[in-house]
Amino acid sequence: MIYNTFELHQEGSLPGAHLVTYIQEYSEAMAINDRPLILLCPGGGYTRTSDREAEPMALKFLAMGYHAAVLRYSCAPAEYPTSLKELAYSIKFLREHAKEWHIDPHKIVVEGCSAGGHLAASLGVFWDEDFLAESQGLSASEHELLRPDGLLLCYPVITSGEFAHRGSFENLLGSRQEELGEKLSLEKQVTNKVPKTFIWHTFADQSVPVENSLLFVSALRRAGVPTEFHMYEKGAHGLALANKLTETNDGRAVQEECLSLIHISEPTRH
């Protein structure tokens, strides 16, 4: 396995921001050559990146036949768009190394949990914005290098409206709530350019209400974006793998009914 850590140095990046890769090394003995990759954005309310939603999930995807990478993005006091630029850089970086690491450059899915889901969905919504391309030294014709091929959103923060997780937006926007709150309420920014999306959430989530996902799914449907949505009756917020591997100290994060890992794209034989 190619296990490496790459520091991130985008404008506004904080010390400690980095990308970790979990790349299955190429072997002539294996039928799969280029594998899809899951780029994970852990949650944490934009105050931190959760350990439970990082390496355990990356290793699970690796065992399923994917390459994986974990983005430890800058959180508060870093503000928007620092973490979005770090995510854009990461997907560009992975595509630039696709041939070397046998990544299928057309099957890079961005996964995000909770506030990390907001970050992942933000790239899904804003990948073709000129400011993002410019931040990566790309021309207007090179936006596609920043586009995820799919989104996998786990109990995501989406809306800044009635059902908002206020803490996430306070940490992300600081004093610019009024200026940027609507722009970062992602259900209001969906177009048909958003990649195909898989979302799951629990009805019982008391931290990030399921309405966040429902609003986003409704917007995706109106825009004609291929979407799959699973809502589970039981389960607290932050389930991660929903099994013993990512269990919290109080045991809340074990919910076997939640099949939280569903294949978006199977590794393809070449």
Where are these regions (language model features)?
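Conserved small/polar residues in nucleotide/adenosyl-binding loops
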Residues: 262-268
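Short amphipathic alpha-helix adjacent to the substrate-entry channel of hydrolases
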Residues: 51-69
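Short beta-strand element of the alpha/beta-hydrolase
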Residues: 34-43
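N-terminal cap/lid segment of alpha/beta-hydrolase-fold proteins
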Residues: 1-32
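Primarily recognizes the serine-hydrolase "nucleophile elbow" in alpha/beta-hydrolase
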Residues: 92-167, 181
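Catalytic nucleophile-loop/oxyanion-hole region of alpha/beta-hydrolase
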Residues: 49-51, 71-105, 256
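Short beta-strand/loop motif that positions the catalytic acidic residue
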Residues: 199-201, 205
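Conserved alpha/beta-hydrolase "acid-adjacent" motif
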Residues: 207-215
